[in-house]
Amino acid sequence: MNNKIPAVEKTIALLELLAKLPEGATQAELKKELGISMSTAYRILQTLLKHKWIRKNADTKYSLDNGLLPLLYPFRNSMELLEHAQKVIDRVSAENEIACKLSIRRGTEQVTIMRAEPEEPFALTGQVGSSFPVIEGSVGAALLCGESDDEIMELIQECSTDLAEKQEPELVLKAVGEVRMKGYAVNLRKNRWNIAAMSMPIRDAEGSVIAAITLIGAESDFAGKKRSKLVSVLKDAVRKCSEGSCRTQGEE
């Protein structure tokens, strides 16, 4: 059964697209990118303009507006936690000489929002703002561990990228199961990035997953006693992120 409302889906897609475009987009560009009619684009834009969720700039481009800010207020503690996390991942990377990143879920995507790298000639974490299918790798498992298996299967079906996880859904369910049971997932199998990774979810005060913290390296970095050490490193990092949020709340 499809319980989704097409008009709402299109509106959300438009907002998500504008979130990726700091300079905004014209009505025609939004129509083309989203595959919707000009009249549908117009009605969505006019509705969002009325509520000041978007604004129309002098160059006829639309961009997000501050009418969205009140919606963020209930999540201020989670945002403070994430802001504190940059210091944590910087320390983790420097002290353990391993790449570390923080990712969040954006609908059907996982997005890198923070990263830290040891002093190496090449980077492993990718650029801040990079996005990948939310079902992919250990990051996906950490971000989705609070979702039902039915929701996860729906995300797998919706994924249009040619991934091992798309072809073999059990890979996703197995990794999610590891997070639920052990608190983390490790991805050592061959993947399109030729890297190994270990991820752990970060939760808010209510227990909801708000981000995933990930260590990235070679397969040998996660072998034997090294893995046990890095599990402890990640657990400590998650704890410090949470402590940072609690400390900020206490200062209010």
Describe the residue ranges of each PLM region.
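N-terminal helix-turn-helix
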Residues: 1-82
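Short, structured helix-loop boundary elements
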Residues: 4-8, 27, 61, 65, ...
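Amphipathic alpha-helical regulatory segments at dimerization interfaces
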Residues: 17, 33, 84-95, 182, ...
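Short, ordered coil/turn segments that flank beta-strands lining enzyme active or ligand-binding pockets
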Residues: 58, 106, 205-206
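Short loop/turn microsegments at loop-to-beta-strand junctions
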Residues: 59, 100, 197-199
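Extended hydrophobic
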Residues: 165-238
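Cysteine/selenocysteine-centered motifs that mediate thiol-based redox chemistry or coordinate metal-sulfur cofactors
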Residues: 238-252
